[in-house]
From Swiss-Prot:
A GO CC term assigned to this protein in UniProt: membrane
Name of the molecule in the record: AAA-ATPase At3g28580
CDD domains: RecA-like_BCS1
One GO BP: response to abscisic acid
SUPFAM superfamilies, A to Z: P-loop containing nucleoside triphosphate hydrolases
Originating species: Arabidopsis thaliana (Mouse-ear cress)
Compositionally skewed regions (Polar residues) per UniProt: 180-193
Cofactor: Mg(2+)
GO molecular function, one term: ATP binding
Length: 500
């Protein structure tokens, strides 16, 4: 027995010495490391009783974050603050408490059915360095699970399933809806191309200034979509739906998006096309969006050259080929910026309903525009933008919603006058302007004062509209007179030439 103990002691000492020598050798002769590592792994594997499993945040050629990694992250968060020695501290908006989580390069233990396992949070730096106007994170994160090889069957068959199930439960319990942005120049802390803040917009369909039947129609459409996973699979289409919101500024397009997100409890991705590098970058952004989300491109007419002024030859080609025939360069909001951007209309069309649009599911894509007539028909046809919603000027029903929201007033003698101005006189005022007039300017102002101010504003709008029409008529008349003068001058010259 003493001889056996001495043998193990000598073996341990020899292995320790060998590891020390290998570490020094690897430091001074790094080129030979890869050739020696397989041999050393086989050697130590005979004596090392533990198995390791690695879960990378991004694995292989996958663009999307690993669901296994995210599940483990949620699972370990429940008791890492009590077990880990190195913690990361963050604060949540609207709360004075500090949220603690497991720091990088930290280890905690976990017990399952009498078996102890070890979890490590690891991080590696990138081996290459490059300069780019579109910087990406230079670190790779992963979790490493270590357990005794005698417990292999239990860990693989039951423990990992337990971790994923519990992690998903914790994630759903703590889920906080987010507003994502792809604005460059922000530090994301990982490889994600999106940064986010908590989505806290209070808009709902109850507070939305719109006709009641129109709101009910939109809500029914959203409910039908959210429950149609099997139906979309049956008909062979990606589980997504496109909405086009169009109308003058101030008619509530952004508020509509917020109401949709709150109604469905979806995250919102605000996609700024002018900051996207190229079509590949656009696909990566799409892949990183989660299910149960709304992807928004606001003012789409300002992001791409979508005026529809295509050549006659292109208009005659079949619709199935429009992705190849209408490819155009991006129009920058500010010339001179983002000159490296190479996103094309073709790339955007593929983003909406091409092969890459099927990655994931349960997504709503929303375009907004002030000038729907300027958009290329190929972009907004059915199948891409399935539902077109006009966000128009304030009607009487929309006014009543605003009066309830702003003043908590449901009936007033002045309602009849406001109804006459909006419906009979057909005065055009946006919901934003109506709301501004209904907003009390001081604590002393009551509902009656605000309603009177709105009536005066509507009358002023009527006079301004009348004045504008008169000015347009005068301008038309001046143009007609100018044309007559030109024609008379031509006729005069013609007579002189004939006389000569």
């Amino acid at each position: 027995m003493a001889m056996m103990g001495q043998l193990w002691t000598n073996t341990g000492s020899a292995l320790a010495t060998l590891m020390f020598v290998y570490t020094i050798f690897k430091q001074f002769f790094p080129l030979f490391g890869p050739q020696l590592e397989p041999f050393l792994y086989r050697l130590f594997g005979r004596f090392y009783p533990y198995i390791q499993i690695t879960f990378h945040e991004y694995s292989g050629e996958h663009f999307k974050r690993s669901e296994a990694y995210l599940g483990i992250q949620s699972y370990l968060s429940k008791d890492s603050s009590a077990r880990a020695k190195k913690l990361k501290a963050n604060t949540t908006k609207g709360s004075k408490s500090i949220v603690l989580s497991m720091d990088d390069k930290e280890e905690i233990t976990d017990d399952f059915e009498g078996i102890r396992v070890w979890w490590q949070s690891k991080k590696e730096g990138a081996t290459r360095q490059s300069f780019s106007f579109y910087p990406e994170a230079n670190e790779k994160r992963y979790y490493m699970l270590r357990f005794h090889r005698r417990d292999r069957e239990v860990i693989i068959e039951r423990y990992l399933e337990h971790v994923m199930r519990e992690g998903k439960t914790i994630e759903q319990k703590n889920r906080e809806r987010k507003l994502y942005s792809n604005t460059p120049g922000q530090s994301h802390g990982n490889n994600s191309k999106w940064s986010h803040v908590t989505f806290e917009h209070p808009a709902t369909f109850d507070t939305l200034a719109m006709e009641e039947n129109k709101k009910e129609e939109i809500k029914s459409d959203l409910i039908k979509f959210s429950k149609s996973k099997d139906y979309y699979k049956k008909i062979g289409k990606a589980w997504k739906r496109g909405y086009l919101l169009f109308g003058p500024p101030g008619t509530g397009k952004s508020t509509m998006i917020a109401a949709m997100a709150n109604f469905l409890e979806y995250d919102v991705y605000d996609l700024e096309l002018t900051t996207v590098k190229d079509n590949t970058h656009l696909r990566r952004l799409l892949i990183e969006t989660s299910a149960k989300s709304i992807i928004v491109i606001e003012d789409i007419d300002c992001s791409l050259n979508l005026t529809g002024q295509r050549k006659k030859k292109e208009e005659e080609e079949e619709d199935g080929d429009d992705k190849n025939t209408i490819e155009k360069k991006m129009m920058m909001k500010n010339e001179g910026e983002n000159k490296e951007s190479k996103v094309t209309l073709s790339g955007l069309l593929n983003f909406i309903d091409g092969l890459w649009s099927a990655c994931g599911g349960e997504r709503i894509i929303v375009f907004t525009t002030n000038f729907v007539d300027k958009l290329d028909p190929a972009l907004i046809r059915k199948g891409r933008m399935d539902k077109h919603i006009e966000m128009s000027y304030c009607c009487f029903e929309a006014f009543k919603v605003l009066a309830k929201n702003y003043l908590d007033v449901e009936e007033s003698e002045m309602f009849e006058e406001i109804k006459r101005l909006l419906e009979v006189e057909e005065i055009k005022m946006t919901p934003a302007d109506v709301g501004e007039n209904l907003l009390p300017k001081s604590e002393k102002e009551g509902g009656e004062t605000c309603l009177k101010r709105l009536i005066e504003a509507l009358k002023e709008e009527k006079e301004e509209a009348k004045k504008k029409v008169e000015e347009e008529e005068e301008e038309k008349q001046r143009k007609k007179e100018k044309v007559k003068e030109i024609e008379a001058e031509k006729e005069k010259k013609k007579k002189i030439e004939e006389e000569n």
